[in-house]
């Protein structure tokens, strides 16, 4: 995942550098360009794949999902509106699916992941939710029309954990019972804050995003040292 994220950041950086070099020969007097119709805030929606880096022997499966929604406020640089800074609040959610694994989220001594072939799970996932604030440094090739042109963004986001729960649907347990749901909500072992590096590259209203968490998911000594990551699609006007 680190290599994928590095590729996205590299594309963002190279795209900005290439466009800046091209503009040196054809400078625009932005004081004469009408930017009054450019929106200063936009809803940003992201959906994609969520995973864990350095997960060790923990068995995950299927397509684990991430969904993020932010209201971003965009502040163009007056001397060059192709460059801008954006910040805004929102929510970030991840759903990690496990394979033949029993997760004890409420263990007082730390989260445990135990391989279990006796219990047959139809669904078994860890769902987390964060209140987040992303900060992006952006470049757009068409600042007067934010629905078109190439766009690049790099930055970081900080989040506060608001929810953590294990949701399971059991087909058959060790006692021969099945067809029931279990939900354990407990954040005692979760790291209360997370910091992640983020990047986006795309055209028009669609872009590819990548995120890599720089902090551990669980508190030190209370769970494995896993680092969540995500990749997917972004829908936004900026």
How would you describe each model-predicted region?
Residues 1-25, 235-238:
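Bacterial Sec-dependent N-terminal signal peptides
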Residues 19-74:
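Short glycine/proline- and aromatic-enriched beta-strand/turn motifs that initiate or cap beta-hairpins
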Residues 21, 31-41, 76-83, 142-150, ...:
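Short loop/turn motifs that connect adjacent beta-strands in outer-membrane beta-barrel proteins
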Residues 38, 182-238:
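Predominantly the C-terminal beta-signal and adjacent terminal strand-loop region
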Residues 39-41, 61-67, 127-133, 148, ...:
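Residues that define the transmembrane beta-barrel architecture of outer-membrane proteins
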Residues 45, 69-75, 89-91, 133-139, ...:
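Residues on the lipid-exposed face of transmembrane beta-strands in outer-membrane beta-barrel proteins
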